[in-house]
Amino acid sequence: MAALKYWVWLAALPGVGSRVKLRLLEHFSSPEEIYYAPPEELLLTGAVDKLQAKLLADKSLTRAEDVLAACAKAGQFIVTMDDTTYPARLRDIFDPPLLLYGKGSMPIFDDEAAIAVVGTRKCTAYGLDVASQLGYELAKQGALVLSGMAKGIDTAAMK
């Protein structure tokens, strides 16, 4: 759980893009090492510029602790890139997410067909109904339904 806090810290850190975070993970063995690295050491990697090194100097773990508490309260799990359950197919894309959030059981993504349902946050009642029905019918047939879990179409598809 302690190591997870540093993954969430890194993923939630504003102003530092995901590609930079991924390059840093190539140089350091863990987000915890990135957390404790001084700005000078971060700069030596060539992965960050001075502004990004300054942003990475924000050592507040409050946001990470809040995310972990909210996930625990909601019964959600977090999968990091170094977790064995992180999908290999996802790890191989150009810009993979550092973390995956989920609820329920963690499916084996590499063995199942997956369908993503994404849409607008500002949707019509008809759109909500269609997304909800679509997500339900797909899941009923055994499909793995994925979404970004944003309010609107994404959330409706996951009900």
For the regions a protein language model found, what residue spans apply to each?
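Short, positively charged patches
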Residues: 1-140
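Phosphate/pyrophosphate-binding betaalpha-module
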Residues: 135-159
